[in-house]
């Protein structure tokens, strides 16, 4: 999706870490908090299925974070984490969301921008 925008002559969206924090913590859009613990989110409201995201910005480069969001199965073939950009492979999707990726190109940049701040 981002590559298509760049090839079409569009500029890559610039991420906003504040918007990214809202998406990551949302239980209705990004959904990250359903599986991951996050700094500032009470344990009772955070998941434990995926790794804790505290310090993720120190553990991975921006490119590594992007790769993990776009193709998580490359790093763990048994992962339950969905791709943030693909439209296939989802089950039990709300009818209005069936043909949409989990995150738009702008939302992906926002989430990456936020994750990079988690040092």
What kind of region is each of these model predictions?
Residues 8-27, 40-42, 119:
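Electrostatic cytochrome c docking/interface patches
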Residues 18-21, 25-33, 46-47, 101-105:
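Sequence context surrounding c-type heme c attachment/ligation sites in exported
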Residues 86-119:
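C-terminal capping alpha-helices of c-type cytochrome domains
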Residues 1-8:
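Bacterial N-terminal signal peptides
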Residues 20, 28-39, 65, 111, ...:
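The canonical Cys-X-X-Cys-His
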Residues 25, 37-71, 80-94:
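Gly/Gly-Pro-rich "capping" loops immediately C-terminal to redox-active cysteine motifs
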């Amino acid at each position: 999706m981002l590559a298509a925008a760049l090839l079409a002559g569009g500029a890559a969206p610039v991420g906003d870490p504040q918007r990214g924090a809202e998406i990551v913590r949302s239980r209705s859009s990004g959904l990250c908090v359903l599986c991951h613990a996050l700094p500032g989110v009470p344990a009772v409201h955070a998941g434990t299925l995926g790794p804790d995201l505290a310090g993720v910005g120190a553990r991975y480069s921006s490119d590594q974070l992007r790769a993990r969001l776009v193709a998580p199965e490359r790093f763990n073939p048994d992962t339950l984490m969905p791709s943030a950009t693909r439209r296939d492979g989802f089950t039990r999707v709300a009818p209005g969301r069936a043909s949409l990726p989990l995150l738009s190109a702008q939302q992906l940049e926002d989430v990456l921008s936020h994750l990079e701040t988690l040092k």
